[in-house]
Amino acid sequence: MAKRVQHEGGDYRPQKRSKNERNGEGSKVSPSAEAIRNELDPISDATYVQSPALGDLSQIEIDQFLAKHCIKVTDSSEAPPLRPIISFSHLPSSFSKIYDPLSSFSSPTPIQSATWPLLFAGRDVIGIAETGSGKTLAFGLPCIKKILDSGKVKRKHARPAAVIISPTRELAMQIYDQLSKFGASVDIRVTCIYGGVKKDEQREALKTAAIVVATPGRLKDLQNDGSVDLGKVKYLVLDEADRMLDKGFEQDIKDIIRSMPDSKRQTVMFTATWPPSVRDLAATFMTSAVTVTIGGDPSADPRANTRIKQVVEVVKPQEKEARLVQLLNRSQRGAAVCDKVLVFCLYKKEAVRVERLLRTKNFKVAGIHGDLNQHERFKSLEAFKTGAATVLVATDVAARGLDIPSVKLVINVTFPLTVEDYVHRIGRTGRAGADGHAITLFTETDKAQSGALINVLRAAKQDVPDALLKFGTTVKKKQHGAYGAFFKDVDTSKSATKIVFDE
């Protein structure tokens, strides 16, 4: 079905999507099934009209904005480029009521500016940006507007119009919290589906939800037992796609997508990195996707947010916990007594021990790790968000996706297993344009990671302590347990299996 884009007074009408253009397996639908799926009116084709104010900007101003925020847009189609939406005043004027919650923000983030016009125009989009860059509203606002444009706000028979898949319960709940604020103003129902809780209430909420935010495992379960029909989904988002593949959800995701309409679906993918496994997934289920990259080359070595001041202290293993207490006493005093500090440990047992230690030192502390049930995790996160707890002790279950505002300091008590996880951890501070601070306690047992860490520090123009340099600057070549140092020659991403490791 054609998509119409109006750009600076001219019309662009790309060709209809063809099922043969897709490389995915199992995407064909029998005529009878297709007829059933078309029982309800589909979400209408997208029409994007650029605002006059945006058109009045000079090309020099547009180029300067793109360069300032390191925005790169790659589009293999012949469609004319769409200008980034630099100001909220440049948003489409129709259904302006949904923009009311934006009043608390000063301007769109770079990923929002670059992807909004493409998504409003109905294009498939791959967004590559650091966590904390405003991705939820980047895909959420076009989702809500698309449903409003269709005139099919009310849903029934557990047939949602849009599905957003995220890797963790915590991230799914965050997305739900943001989108429900926008949906409530226009009577669009949003529901959140995740594991660890009973299914009955979720089944009931699915009956009338227009937008479903879900983790892949629970969504697959509810789909298998007939609680939800994805045959009417016209807008699909895969958020933190790289993280979902890391967690072994590739087959679940493929099965879920194959149950959705093929030719009338707009697909959006957001990811922090761009490994071959994510590229393969995008090529399988997306059509002529536009890639929007914020920052440097996502396939290169991991890079930390340059707004984060990184400090690495080389200490003895037995000194770490005492040094942690000193750092917290120093950081939480005077005007900063209520500042939020996120403390990362490597294993669950370590996190429990550190949490107990800090509680004995009279810090207002909460914890989040794999041994806690959903209610306990939610309680800890809420305590941290509201300020009832100013220190949150976490394992890497919280390293990606959690949107906790105003984290002033991240402390790594134990260095993670990879430098990529290090970058994700410290990315919890310095979000939404703010400055951040991260302190890492590095020991001799972590020396295999010294070279990679030094590269991250140097790339962000941070100081590299002499004690860290003594461990060496060599970056250890990645190895695979079965294929050794030559694992890159073997594509292991084709048959991902869900494996859960003890933290």
UniProtKB/Swiss-Prot annotation:
Q: What class of enzyme is it?
A: hydrolase
Q: Which residues form the Helicase C-terminal domain?
A: 307-472
At which positions is motif DEAD box?
239-242
- Keyword ATP-binding attributed: yes
Q: Name the SMART domains on file.
A: DEXDc, HELICc
Q: Composition bias, kind Basic and acidic residues: at what positions?
A: 1-25
Q: What is its EC number?
A: 3.6.4.13
Q: Where is this motif: Q motif?
A: 104-112
Give the domain of life. Answer: Eukaryota
| GO molecular function annotations of the record | ATP binding; ATP hydrolysis activity; RNA binding; RNA helicase activity
UniProt comment concerning the protein's domains: The Q motif is unique to and characteristic of the DEAD box family of RNA helicases and controls ATP binding and hydrolysis.
Name this polypeptide is given: ATP-dependent RNA helicase dbp3
Organism from which the protein derives: Neosartorya fischeri (strain ATCC 1020 / DSM 3700 / CBS 544.65 / FGSC A1164 / JCM 1740 / NRRL 181 / WB 181)
